[in-house]
């Protein structure tokens, strides 16, 4: 007679579709900071994140709203367009290089990896700012 359940418990963030733990573990094994790019409905966010036992530590954070405040981006323009994503990535890359980081690994989360899209536009900005991130040239957007 069988006892117990055959169900396998699924982690909450995986069940909600927020985290791919297999991909996250691969990124963490590299022991390099992660250049996290997230595109929401209103803006682009770029962060430089390092792993810690108590939780991830964000060392640099730049969002599309920072373009308005610090860099004079026109208020009526989109904060999630390809050009805005490039500028957010460039600002994050400059801040990361200024803080002493020289390398990172791109973390796009569960976003679709569309070549030439907003995520890779932010990647191009980070690379142009001097941050060394492994990538293929075919995914970057055109000039």
What are these regions (language model features)?
Residues 11, 18-20, 92, 102-103, ...:
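N-terminal nicking endonuclease/strand-transfer module with a His-rich metal-binding environment
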Residues 43-49, 105-114:
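Histidine-centered divalent-metal-coordination microenvironment in nucleic-acid enzymes
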Residues 107-143:
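Positively charged, low-complexity, intrinsically disordered RNA-binding extensions
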Residues 1-56, 60-61, 65-71, 137, ...:
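Intrinsically disordered, Lys/Arg-rich N-terminal extensions and targeting peptides
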Residues 73-78, 104-110:
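Short, flexible active-site loops
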Residues 96-103, 114:
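Beta-rich strand-turn-strand
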Residues 58, 84, 88, 92, ...:
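Amphipathic alpha-helical interface surfaces
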Residues 73-97:
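Acidic helix/loop or adjacent segment enriched in Glu/Asp that either coordinates divalent metal
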């Amino acid at each position: 007679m069988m006892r117990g359940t055959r169900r396998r418990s699924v982690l909450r963030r995986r069940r909600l579709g927020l985290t791919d733990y297999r991909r996250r573990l691969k990124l963490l094994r590299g022991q390099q900071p992660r250049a996290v790019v997230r595109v929401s409905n209103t803006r682009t966010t770029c962060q430089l994140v390092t792993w810690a036992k108590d939780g991830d530590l964000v060392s640099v954070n730049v969002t599309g709203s920072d373009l308005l405040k610090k860099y004079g981006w026109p208020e009526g323009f989109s904060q999630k367009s390809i050009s805005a994503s490039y500028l957010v990535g460039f600002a994050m890359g400059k801040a990361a290089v200024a803080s002493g980081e020289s390398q990172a690994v791109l973390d796009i989360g569960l976003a679709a990896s569309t070549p030439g899209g907003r995520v890779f536009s932010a990647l191009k900005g980070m690379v142009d700012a001097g941050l060394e991130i492994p990538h293929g040239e075919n995914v970057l957007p055109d000039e």
